[in-house]
Design a protein with these regions (language model features):
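Bacterial N-terminal signal peptides that target proteins for export
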Residues: 1-8
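Conserved, well-structured interaction surfaces
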Residues: 41, 72-181, 417-424
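Membrane-proximal, proline-rich intrinsically disordered regions
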Residues: 3, 20-71, 85, 237, ...
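Short coil/linker segments at helix-helix boundaries
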Residues: 139-169, 179, 185-196, 201, ...
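Extended ligand-binding clefts on enzyme/binding-domain cores
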Residues: 229-429, 443
Length: 450
C-alpha cells in the first residue's frame, strides 16, 4: 500500500510540473523575440536603421580620404585617413553595422515575407541587399556575397564584378516586387518602413535612381549592356525616366533631437532618432574643411562663382574680438566668420609645419592657438565642424560652445549636414538631374546637359 501511494504521488508531481510549465509558457516574450517569432515588418525598421548608419559612416570616412575634410594634426584615425595614411580597421565600422546590424536579419525577413506573400517587404529586401552589398564592394572590392549570410562561418569571397552584377540583378527583382499588388490582409509596408513611409512609388523611384547611380560607375568599362558590366548610357536614361521627377520624390530620412530612450544595440548605446552623421562627425571635435572643398564651394573651377550652399556647409565661429590682418578669404557676417580651407596639397601645406592646430578660447583673449610657432597663429581661421544638441546634450541650441554651455563668445555653428536633426538624403531629384546632365554631356548633347 505504501509503495502504491508513492507511485501515485510521483505521478501527481510529474503532472503538476508539466502543467506548470505549460501554464507559464502561454506567451512569446515581445521584448526578446527569437528568429522564429520576430515579425518581418518589425525586422525591416531594424534593417533600415543599421543599413543607413553603415552607409553614412562609410560616407564620412570616404569624404576624409577623398579630400573634402581633414582633422587637426595628429588627430588620430581620421587625420591619417585625410593624409592617405590609413590605419588597420579604418572601414570596419560600416562592415560591422551592415553585417551585424542589418544583413543578418535579411534572409529571415525575406522567408517570413514570402510565406505571407508580402511582395513589398520582399521588394524592400532585394533593394536593401543590393544597396548594402554595393557599398561593401565599393569599400572593399572583394567580399563574401553569394555565400554570405548563411550558415558557413567562412564564406567564399566573390570578386567585384560578381557582386556588382548580382546587385544590379537583385535591384531589378526588387523593383518588380515593389510593383506587385499585395492582398489587403497582408501587413502594409508602412508598418515597418520609415524610409519611404510605405510609399511603394517612392521606393520604385529611389530604386531606379540607385540603378542609374550604379550603372554610371561603369563609365570607364566601355560601352555595352549594363547586365554584362558595361557602361550603358541608355539604361541610365531609362532608369532616370522612372526615377525622381521632383523634390517630392526624394527619399529622405528626417531625424529628430528628442534624446530617444531607444538606443542602438551594437555597443555605441546612442539614441536611434538622431542623424548618424552627428554621431560620427557633428558631435566630435577637430574636423575642418579642406582647401579643395572650400575652393569647390566658393570658386568652382576658377569661375569666381560661389555655391549658394557654401555658407551652410562651411562652419562658422563667433568672434567678438577680430584680429587685424585676417586672411583675405575669410568671410564675415557681423561677428561671425566663416572657415577657411586647410591646404592639403601644396608646399605650404600646414601638415609640413606641424599644423593645422586646434583653436582654443578664453573669455579674456578670445580665440588663440596654443603654440609658440608664429606660422600657426592663423590656424584660428580653420573653424571646426562641431555642433551640439538640445535633446541629447541638453544644450540651449544646436551651436557648440567651445568654452562651455554658458560662454556664447565661443560659439561654433557646425555644418548643416552633420547636425543632430539634419536629414539624410538617400536619393534626391537633384542627384538624378546631375547624373542625367553628365550622361548627356558625355554623349555630346551639351544643350540638353545644361
Amino acid at each position: 500500500m505504501k509503495y502504491l501511494k508513492s507511485i501515485i504521488m510521483s505521478l501527481l508531481l510529474v503532472m503538476l510540473l508539466a502543467s506548470c510549465n505549460e501554464w507559464l509558457n502561454v506567451n512569446t516574450d515581445p521584448d526578446n523575440p527569437s528568429s522564429e517569432s520576430a515579425l518581418f515588418q518589425n525586422r525591416l525598421a531594424h534593417i533600415e536603421f543599421y543599413t543607413n548608419h553603415a552607409q553614412q559612416f562609410a560616407a564620412w570616412r570616404t569624404s576624409m580620404s577623398m579630400g573634402d575634410w581633414t582633422r587637426y594634426n595628429g588627430g588620430g584615425t581620421y587625420f591619417n585617413m585625410s593624409i592617405w595614411y590609413p590605419v588597420g580597421g579604418i572601414c570596419t565600422t560600416p562592415y560591422q553595422w551592415w553585417f551585424v546590424g542589418a544583413a543578418c536579419n535579411l534572409n529571415d525577413m525575406y522567408k517570413r515575407a514570402e510565406e505571407a506573400e508580402a511582395w513589398h517587404y520582399m521588394g524592400a529586401f532585394k533593394i536593401i541587399r543590393a544597396y548594402g552589398f554595393m557599398m561593401m564592394t565599393d569599400l572593399y572590392g572583394e567580399m563574401p556575397y553569394t555565400d554570405a549570410l548563411g550558415e558557413n562561418a567562412t564564406p567564399e569571397y566573390d570578386d567585384g564584378k560578381t557582386i556588382y552584377l548580382g546587385c544590379i540583378e537583385e535591384l531589378d527583382e526588387g523593383l518588380a516586387l515593389m510593383a506587385k499588388t499585395q492582398a489587403p490582409t497582408t501587413p502594409a509596408l508602412a508598418l515597418g518602413d520609415y524610409w519611404g513611409n510605405g510609399d511603394t512609388q517612392k521606393w520604385i523611384k529611389w530604386g531606379n535612381l540607385l540603378k542609374a547611380r550604379f550603372i554610371n560607375k561603369l563609365i570607364k568599362k566601355g560601352a555595352g549592356s549594363y547586365k554584362e558590366g558595361k557602361f550603358d548610357s541608355q539604361a541610365i536614361l531609362d532608369a532616370l525616366a522612372k526615377g525622381p521627377q521632383s523634390i517630392n520624390d526624394n527619399m529622405v530620412i528626417y531625424h529628430t533631437d528628442n534624446n530617444s530612450t531607444t538606443h542602438d544595440v551594437l555597443g555605441w548605446n546612442e539614441p536611434v532618432d538622431y542623424s548618424p552623421l552627428y554621431s560620427v562627425s557633428g558631435m566630435n571635435a577637430g574636423y575642418m574643411p579642406t582647401k579643395m572643398l572650400f575652393d569647390n564651394l566658393t570658386n568652382f573651377a576658377g569661375y569666381g562663382v560661389e555655391d549658394p550652399r557654401a555658407d551652410r556647409i562651411l562652419p562658422w565661429a563667433y568672434d567678438a574680438n577680430p584680429r587685424a590682418g585676417a586672411p583675405a578669404d575669410v568671410k564675415w557676417s557681423g561677428n561671425w566668420r566663416r572657415s577657411r580651407g586647410v591646404d592639403m596639397t601644396s608646399g605650404d601645406c600646414p601638415i609640413f609645419q606641424g599644423g593645422p592646430l586646434r583653436a582654443n578660447f578664453s573669455t579674456t583673449n578670445g580665440w588663440f592657438i596654443q603654440s609658440d610657432n608664429p606660422a600657426r597663429a592663423n590656424d584660428i581661421y580653420y573653424v571646426e565642424a562641431t555642433s551640439s544638441s538640445k535633446g541629447y546634450a541638453a544644450n540651449p541650441d544646436l551651436l557648440y560652445r567651445r568654452a562651455g554651455k554658458t560662454v556664447d563668445g565661443s560659439r561654433e555653428s557646425g555644418t548643416f549636414y552633420t547636425r543632430v536633426s539634419s536629414p539624410t538624403y538617400m536619393g534626391s531629384y537633384a542627384e538624378a538631374c546631375f547624373i542625367k546632365a553628365e550622361v548627356l554631356f558625355n554623349k555630346g548633347d551639351k544643350s540638353g546637359a545644361f
